[in-house]
C-alpha cells in the first residue's frame, strides 16, 4: 500500500491526504507494449496508483481519477550499440562529456577510476562504500532514499553497481537492477564536495559504456523526466501516473483538493517566470 496523495512543492511534501492505494508499476517493457495493465482486486484499499501508464492506454476502472504527472519515460537503446548511441547525442553533449572526463582525470592523476561490481561478493564490497557516499547526498538528507541501508536490498544476483573514485575515496555511485529486458536507473548519487568535477556525469558515461554489448536491450531511466535523461536518452515513451479511487464523495473531494493545489502551484510558477522575464527586459 502507498499514499501518493501528497501536497508537494518540488521535493517537499507540505501535507498528505491519507488513502490506501494498490500500486501498479509498469515496467519499461510493458510501457513500450502500450497496453493498459489488468488491475488487481482492491480488497480494503481505497484505489489504485498506476505508474508509467502509456498515454494511449485506457484503464478498465471507474471512479474519480487524477493524473499525478505526465512525462516521457526515457531509455538508452543498448542493443543498437555504443557507436549508434554516441552518434545520436548532440555535438554539444559529446563535447561536454569529453570536457568533464578530462577535468576529472586531471584531478585524479591523469586517469578515471571507475570500478564495476557484478557478483554478490563484489556487491557486498560495493554497499558500504556506496552508503558512505549516499550519506552525503541531498536525497539522503531530504528524502532518505539515496541507497538502501540494508545490504540485502543491494546484494542481489540481478544487480550491478559502479563506483567512481578520486584517489582512494569513492565520490559517486550508481546501482541498477534488472527488469525484463532493461537495466533500471535505481539509485545514483555523488558527494557534493566533488560536484565541480561532475562525478555523476562521468560515472554515468562509464556505466553505459560497460553495459553496451551485454544481454540487456535497454537502460531504463524510470519514471519522471530531467535534463540529464533528455540529454543521454536515445528513445522514450509518453506516460502518465494515474490515481483511480473508489466512487464516493470523500474520494472526489480528495482528488479535487489535489487538482486545486497543483493548479495553484503551476500558476505561481508561471507568475514567477513572467516576473523574472519582465525584470530582465526592464534592465
Predicted segments, located by residue:
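Hydrophobic alpha-helix feature that most strongly marks membrane-spanning transmembrane helices
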Residues: 135, 169, 175, 203, ...
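Conserved GNAT acetyl-CoA-binding A-motif
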Residues: 44-52, 211-223
Amino acid at each position: 500500500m502507498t499514499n501518493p496523495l501528497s501536497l508537494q512543492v518540488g521535493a517537499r511534501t507540505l501535507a498528505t491526504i491519507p488513502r490506501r492505494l494498490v500500486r501498479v508499476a509498469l515496467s519499461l517493457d510493458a510501457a513500450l507494449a502500450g497496453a493498459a495493465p489488468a488491475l488487481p482486486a482492491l480488497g480494503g484499499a481505497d484505489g489504485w496508483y498506476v505508474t508509467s501508464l502509456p498515454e494511449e492506454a485506457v484503464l478498465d476502472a471507474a471512479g474519480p481519477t487524477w493524473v499525478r504527472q505526465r512525462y516521457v519515460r526515457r531509455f538508452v537503446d543498448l542493443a543498437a550499440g555504443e557507436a549508434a548511441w554516441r552518434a545520436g547525442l548532440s555535438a554539444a553533449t559529446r563535447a561536454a562529456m569529453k570536457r568533464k572526463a578530462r577535468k576529472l582525470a586531471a584531478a585524479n592523476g591523469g586517469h578515471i577510476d571507475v570500478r564495476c561490481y557484478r557478483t554478490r561478493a563484489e556487491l557486498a564490497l560495493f554497499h558500504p562504500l556506496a552508503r558512505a557516499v549516499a550519506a552525503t547526498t541531498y536525497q539522503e538528507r531530504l528524502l532518505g532514499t539515496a541507497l538502501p541501508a540494508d545490504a540485502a536490498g543491494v546484494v542481489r544476483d540481478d544487480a550491478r553497481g559502479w563506483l567512481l573514485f578520486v584517489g582512494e575515496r569513492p565520490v559517486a555511485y550508481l546501482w541498477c537492477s534488472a527488469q525484463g529486458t532493461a537495466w533500471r536507473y535505481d539509485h545514483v548519487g555523488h558527494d557534493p564536495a566533488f560536484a565541480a568535477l561532475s562525478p555523476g556525469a562521468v560515472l554515468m558515461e562509464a556505466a553505459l559504456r560497460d553495459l553496451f554489448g551485454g544481454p540487456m536491450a535497454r537502460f531504463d531511466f524510470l519514471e519522471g523526466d530531467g535534463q540529464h535523461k533528455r540529454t543521454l536518452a536515445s528513445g522514450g515513451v509518453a506516460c502518465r501516473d494515474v490515481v483511480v479511487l473508489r466512487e464516493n464523495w470523500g474520494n472526489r473531494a480528495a482528488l479535487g483538493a489535489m487538482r486545486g493545489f497543483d493548479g495553484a502551484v503551476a500558476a505561481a510558477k508561471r507568475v514567477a517566470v513572467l516576473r523574472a522575464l519582465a525584470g530582465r527586459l526592464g534592465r
